[in-house]
Amino acid sequence: AFCPIKSGDDSQEVAAYRKAAKDAGILIAEVGAFGNNPISPDDDKRATGISNCQAKLSLADEIDANCAVNVTGSRGDGWADCHPDNLTADTFDLIVASVREIVDGVKPKRAVYAIETMPWLYPDSVDSYLDLLKAIDRDSCGVHFDPVNIVTSPDRYYHTGELLKDSFRKL
């Protein structure tokens, strides 16, 4: 299940949801951190994006969810917009720095900050996932694998079986 409450909610309410889920045998799989842009070109939006992602990761850890999930962000106006600067070496480095800031600021005990693939953002392939994970170098950073988001060419479409096998083998 996804997390039914928002970050910033009362810790007693979080504890009640955590207990209710456990008692019912329900795993709270994720806390969505979508809508936040931790690599925004606007410094205020970037700082807000990082802070909000940290709050979501804290909630995930407190409610015993597996992860807080988001895309890496965009160099455009929106949090997940297409932009020519999204797939550059400088943006890759900025993603590494922002994810480190998110996870190092929270130091979660259980949950991970999981990055989801997108066709026009890093990670846009399994290999770029591996490159990011290696560069970020934090156990509290994880994978939220949505293979539909990397089926972006006729070759990948017609060979999705091989794509999936390769993805699971590598990840």
Model segments located where?
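Glycoside hydrolase catalytic-domain groove-lining segments
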Residues: 137, 154-171
